[in-house]
Design a protein with these regions (language model features):
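Flexible "stalk/tail and boundary" regions
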Residues: 1-11, 15, 25-95, 99-100, ...
């Protein structure tokens, strides 16, 4: 089963907030939605609540279920559980991909990340992110370049995976 999103792409956003999802991302959404059958629209959940994040985080149904199980395992009434419920349940938007492969992003979500005209999609493992292209370039691309610049020229970042759990 395909579980990982890979790649990045730019897509136009129309005035109603409709934006095409990369085709490869749609395949992952389909395979990670236990209720999906061919001809149906795959579901996903867009989490937008963290004010420190200038992007929308899009979860497959399987990925958000994993998050929900971890939240449910926390003690009832604990501050951590309350805050995580607020972020992942309350400040989230369940939706689906329409028959033409598009998402409809409500005005509230577009306003949160100042999105108009064009969206930048980037894979993040079992989620993907939607950014305003200029924000991504200014914030994330700069961080990655700075991080790489601090490493020796011949350094292979895969060395960080040596000794990773689950080998």
């Amino acid at each position: 089963m395909v579980r990982r999103f890979r790649g990045e792409s730019h897509h136009k956003v129309d005035t109603k907030g409709r934006v095409s999802i990369p085709a490869s991302f749609r395949r992952v959404l389909e395979s990670s939605d236990p209720n999906w059958t061919p001809g149906d629209a795959p579901e996903l959940v867009i989490v937008y609540g963290d004010h420190r994040r200038n992007y929308l985080e899009c979860y497959t149904m399987e990925a958000i279920e994993e998050v929900d199980k971890k939240i449910d395992a926390l003690p009832r009434g604990s501050m951590e559980r309350k805050m995580l419920q607020r972020l992942f349940h309350g400040q989230s938007y369940p939706t689906n991909v329409d028959e033409t492969g598009r998402l409809v992003l409500p005005a509230k979500l577009r306003q949160k990340i100042d999105l108009e005209g064009e969206a930048f999609f980037i894979a993040a493992g079992d989620t993907f992110q939607v950014w305003k292209p200029e924000t991504y370039e200014a914030e994330e691309l700069a961080k990655t370049e700075e991080w790489l610049d601090e490493l020796p020229e011949d350094f292979d970042p895969l060395v960080f995976l040596d000794g990773a759990k689950g080998e």
